[in-house]
Amino acid sequence: MTSNVRTKMATSVLQPESRREHEPKAEIPESPRLTDDERMAILEAKERETGELPAELRERARIEMREEPAIREHALAQMRHFIEKHPAIKKSRTDAPFLLRFLRTKKYSVPQACAMLERYLSLRQVHPHWFQKLDPLDPKIAAVIDAGYLVPLPKRDAEGRRVVLSCMGRFDPYVYDSCVMARVHSMIVELLLDEPRSQLLGYTHVNDEAGMQMPHVSLWSFNDVRTMLNCIQNSTPMRHKCTHFVNVPHYGAKFFEFAVSLLSDKLKDRVMFHRNTQDLNKHVDPAILPKEYGGTVPLRDMIEELKRKLLKHREELLALDEMCVDVNALEKNDITQDVHSTAGSFRKLELD
């Protein structure tokens, strides 16, 4: 075989490969990058499972509520012992995220945290029409959620607090009663209470009363308002940092004045009334609010995200009804004194 033939054959064999080297290569599609909001949602979901605060908030927790690893573990052990030995508590959650609700609210005063746990379990037993059967698939509850009456906003405020928006005009008082309203609130609260960031930083409430009618006011008796506010203030492990009311009609003003008069002085100082949304936006960044209030994300999108979260945690919400306490036995119980008697060793641990 001549050298010319060999060269020709080699060229014919190599040419296709050579051509492929110069052809544009097919790009491998990249997995979609997460937005900052999506990344934060994943982080918060992991924190919720463990009860652990993110690194950037641990120093603040140490300063504000004396939280350190040794103190936290000792306090959790004390609360679990309290529950185990309590003659009136038949069943209760004992996981860290649940118990940390009470410890962080009471800044690691174990006796106060245990006392609040007693009250919390008791109120669920005494007022089941308000605090039990928190099922997102219940037709009435699902309809109220879908209407957008109560929505925790995806983004936190400037202080890092979870913001809960209520829109009274989206609750139909001709179809639903105060029990449905209370159960919707209880369900949303339970969904949020296990968030470590919120246990430390607290909550901001924005209540838009536009569309409020007299039937809304008549849903609640003065007695029920008094009882509910007592439950919220003294039995719910939730740090209420700021409450905004906006667009309150003249016939609703007296109702809210009465309600605010029942609050502790500390909570009274955290209530603000605004004439309109523009005034509200001076205190709450409109960027975190729904598009209808000056933000960028439509309220409908926020509602759909809430519905997904509620379904994800539905079993947890329903399992709350398995907790049980003998309310009558609570009055005869003196085990809280045992917690007080061990508080000295807890304080010693704080100082060591």
For the regions a language model picked out, list residue spans one by one.
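Basic, amphipathic alpha-helical/coil surface patches used to engage anionic, phosphate-bearing ligands
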Residues: 1-352
